[in-house]
Amino acid sequence: MVTMKDLLECGVHFGHQTRRWNPKTKKFIFGVRKNIHIIDLQKTLRYFRYTYNIVRDASAQGKSIMFVGTKKQANETLKEFAESIQVPYVNYRWLGGMLTNFSTIRKSVRKLEIIEEMENSGQIDLLTKKEKLMILRKKEKLDKYLGGVRHMKKIPDMIFVIDVAKEKIAVAEARKLHIPIVAPLDTNCDPDLVDYPIPGNDDAIRSIRLFCKEMSEAILEGRELMQEEIVHADENSEEIEFVSNEEKEEMLAEIQKEITQGAE
């Protein structure tokens, strides 16, 4: 789990210029240095650990979590961690309706799958060069926008967002559907939009990497807990069944004994 040293080394305490702040973040600010707001890392650490547990527990309950972060500093890092733990993600551009009109998004994913099937079967080679080029361009575009959500069969139970100010459409859709939002909260962000905020820098690459890493580890830990629960439940089930059969045999023996004694 994250430490104060991690937060300092990754520059999580650096907020935005004072003229760009959101007054609602005042409670998370420690002070000002060279016109830059400094975030209170004691509060960051407390919120970080609390949110880590929230995400871990959600994962342990089998809930799905989507990663969202499309800005330049975040997109590659977010994709790396999302793919490493096999969760859906959006790292290029958020398409309107990705949550609120999910059925349409699924249709677009299906188009991508059909084009890939055409490639694999060789059917695409039967087209003219112009037609083939157009279809391959379509595939490239679909994969860029939807590659991270192509295996997502339903809307997520929670979303983890890098920069809620930039990802305002994703945040608005999640709030409309009452999907909990987890996010680092920089000094220019509105804390009222985030269910589980972590006060911190959402612009520096090292800080973003730390947030992605910790949320990924929370999800993995939750999966391990869920697996342990399943194994434990199976063991208990087998034990109960064994004891139950033994009791039945003992009762049957007693009944047979009573019958024999009665016959005598």
Curated annotation (Swiss-Prot):
GO terms for biological process: translation. Pfam families: Ribosomal_S2 (PF00318). Keywords: Ribonucleoprotein, Ribosomal protein. PROSITE patterns: RIBOSOMAL_S2_1, RIBOSOMAL_S2_2. The keyword Hydrolase does not apply. CDD domains: RPS2. The keyword Ribosomal protein applies. InterPro entries: Ribosomal_uS2, Ribosomal_uS2_bac/mit/plastid, Ribosomal_uS2_CS, Ribosomal_uS2_flav_dom_sf. GO terms for molecular function: structural constituent of ribosome. GO terms for cellular component: cytosolic small ribosomal subunit. Belongs to the universal ribosomal protein uS2 family. NCBIfam families: rpsB_bact. HAMAP family: Ribosomal_uS2_B. This is Small ribosomal subunit protein uS2. It comes from Helicobacter pylori (strain P12). The lineage of its organism: Bacteria, Pseudomonadati, Campylobacterota, Epsilonproteobacteria, Campylobacterales.
